[in-house]
C-alpha cells in the first residue's frame, strides 16, 4: 500500500438502513423523518494506491467489498462498501454529496426526507450512467 493511505472514518445517521431498492439492487433508506440540511453520511480516508500498485499485484482488493475512486492521475482510493455506496441515482434527489475530493464522501439531506424514503443523489453523467431507473417524473432519460 501507498504511504499516502489514510485512516478510514465512517459515520452514518442511525436513521438509515440498507434495503432492497426499486431503483437498483440495494439502497439506503430513512427509518424516520430527516430534516433538510442534516448530515446523512460521512466517510473520510481510505486505502490509497497507484495504478502501478494495482497492475503489479501489490494491492489486491475484492471488488465486491470496496468502492474505488480516482483522486489524481494514476492515484486511487478505496473504502469498504457501506451506506455511501448504496445511495442510488435519481434525477430528483433528496440528498447531495458535498465532497470536493475523492478522499471524502459527505451526503447531506437536500430537502426533507420522509420515513421509508430511499436516499438518492444526482450523479448523472452520460459517460458512466448508461441507464436511469429513478422512476421520477423529472427523469432526464425519459423521452
Model feature map: region roles:
Residues 91-143:
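C-terminal SET catalytic tail plus cysteine-rich post-SET Zn-binding segment of SAM-dependent SET-domain
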Residues 2-96:
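Catalytic cores of histone-lysine modification enzymes
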